[in-house]
Regions:
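Short secondary-structure subsegments characteristic of cysteine-rich extracellular domains
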Residues: 106-127
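Extended, compositionally biased alpha-helical segments that mediate assembly or anchoring
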Residues: 190-288
Length: 288
């Protein structure tokens, strides 16, 4: 993830291992239990009881920013690390995927197919433990691509050697294509998604970001105006769509109503103060 935007500079000091789940849990747990002198000053100077949850390097593990995070879908109020510790990993949360502004729901079907195939590719590919140098190398590559990915001929580091984003990307796509040929999945759709990605790597003018630039410049409008116009167009599309609701829409609406009912139950049933709730959440529901 880029260093542009919201930052917690203390996180730059963290080296959270992705080699083993136990290491990931232990190191994040240590960060949530280690007091930061910098954050301690906030607690002592503001005079507000709940100016922050705690003065630790991480207040809770959810504050840790990374491009992906292991998650548990176990339904409980326990903290995420405790759920991971007791129930394992159910899914991977991808946190650095740009929305496609030209798609009403933010992502296209072929994009979803590509992500599915890419995750399967990552799962089956040999992955050795990362050392500190390799972890920093990955971090530096992420920063370069997130900030300068549109620059022609951008070079990043692969095993201490330089390689262009384009060449490495094409290597990965070739390996993903081999995976399709060896599996029983619906090959045609996945081949199409790979073909689309390959074209964008070979010609960055075909990427959504390039289309954004072109429309903003050609229309002589600001980025904000561009976003507003696109949002209005998507809104009209939804409003003008068929009155018949899809199964997904019904599921979402049912979930909204269920959440409202559960919220009211909590309000009426709980006499616990926020202070007690916070102590219970931070202490009783943390991993062992």
């Amino acid at each position: 993830m880029s260093d542009i935007g919201y930052q917690n500079t203390k996180q730059k000091e963290l080296q959270i291992s992705l080699n083993k789940l136990s290491e990931y849990i232990d190191q994040l747990k240590a960060a949530t239990n280690t007091t930061s002198n910098e954050f301690l000053k906030i607690e002592n100077s503001h005079g507000v009881e709940f100016s922050q949850l705690s003065p630790n390097v991480l207040q809770i593990e959810d504050e840790y920013y990374s491009s992906s995070r292991p998650k548990s879908s176990y339904n409980s109020e326990d903290r995420m690390l405790k759920k991971l510790q007791e129930h394992g990993v159910d899914y991977i949360e991808l946190r650095s995927i740009d929305l496609n502004p030209f798609k009403p729901c933010g992502i296209g079907y072929r994009n979803l197919l590509f992500l599915e195939l890419f995750l399967i590719y990552c799962l089956q590919k040999d992955s050795f433990d990362l050392n500190d140098y390799e972890t920093k190398e990955i971090r530096n590559n992420d920063l370069l691509v997130s900030k300068e990915g549109r620059r022609p001929g951008l070079m990043i580091t692969k095993s201490k050697s330089k390689i262009s984003v384009k060449d490495w990307g094409l290597e990965i796509l070739d390996e993903m294509e081999e995976l399709i040929s060896e599996s029983n999945i619906k090959k045609e759709l996945f081949y199409e998604s790979l073909s689309e990605s390959r074209k964008m790597l070979q010609d960055p003018n075909l990427t959504p970001s390039s289309e954004v630039f072109s429309q903003v410049i050609d229309s002589n409008i600001s980025y904000e105006e561009f976003g507003k116009n696109l949002g209005e167009a998507h809104k009209k599309q939804y409003l003008n769509s068929s009155d018949s609701k899809s199964d997904n829409e019904r599921v979402i609406e049912n979930e909204i109503e269920r959440s409202k009912v559960e919220s009211e139950k909590l309000k009426n049933a709980s006499e616990e103060s926020f202070k007690d709730y916070l102590r219970n959440y931070l202490i009783d529901k943390k991993p062992k």
